[in-house]
Design a protein with these regions (language model features):
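Conserved metal-binding segment of the jelly-roll/cupin
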Residues: 62-65, 100-120, 131
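Conserved short histidine dyad/triad with adjacent acidic residue
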Residues: 38-45, 56-72
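Double-stranded beta-helix
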Residues: 3, 115-185
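Short histidine-centered beta-strand/loop micro-motifs
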Residues: 46-51, 68-73, 90, 97-99, ...
Length: 185
């Protein structure tokens, strides 16, 4: 059973889990992969419980005014607020929104653009469940990929992060290009 135990104080978060991790409003955030690999684009992120469970469980902590950029998933995603106050917004333009607090839950359907931000006054935590053993991939709105590239961050066609300031794109890989406006809508 010890390989199925995750103590929060023993988890090792990624502080650069996604392509937008260097952008203002996204860089003071930690991502934890607790059960399964989740959708983190950081290939070095530690996965605490690696055996398949039929779902993936992770956690996100963020400082005030930090969270994720607009993105979609190919699997359902459920957020369980543990602490703090979070704004969730959705749609290709991100104009629909709600505020959630400790104990609240929201289930985001597949292929819908969504994002979240800590709107409280201290670091806050939530748990995230992704459906299925295969958590699928993330699709970012074009603006996020373009701004991330300006910081040197890009995504490769295997959905892994690359720091263009440190390394070149491997010959057997291509960078993911932003989706078109038609694909966004």
């Amino acid at each position: 059973m010890i390989d199925r135990l995750a103590k929060f104080n023993e988890l090792v978060p990624s502080s650069l889990p996604f392509v937008e991790g260097r952008l203002e409003g996204h860089k003071e955030r930690k991502n934890y992969t607790i059960i399964g690999r989740g959708v983190a684009e950081d290939t070095k992120q530690l996965i605490k419980i690696q055996s398949l469970h039929g779902y993936n469980l992770g956690a996100v902590s963020a400082m005030p005014k930090n969270g994720s950029g607009l993105h979609s998933h190919t699997t359902a995603e459920v957020f369980v607020i543990y602490s703090g106050k979070w704004r969730f917004y959705w749609g290709a333009d991100g104009k629909q929104e709600t505020i959630l607090e400790a104990g609240d839950i929201i289930s985001m359907p597949t292929n819908m653009f969504r994002a979240f931000e800590n709107v409280g006054d201290k670091e806050s935590l939530m748990f995230v469940v992704l459906g299925g053993d295969d958590p699928g991939i993330i699709t970012w709105v074009p603006e996020i990929l373009k701004k991330a590239k300006e910081t040197g961050m890009a995504l490769l066609d295997d959905n892994s992060l690359i720091d263009l300031k440190k390394v070149e794109v491997p010959k057997d890989r291509k960078m993911i290009e932003p989706i078109t406006q038609d694909e966004l809508e």
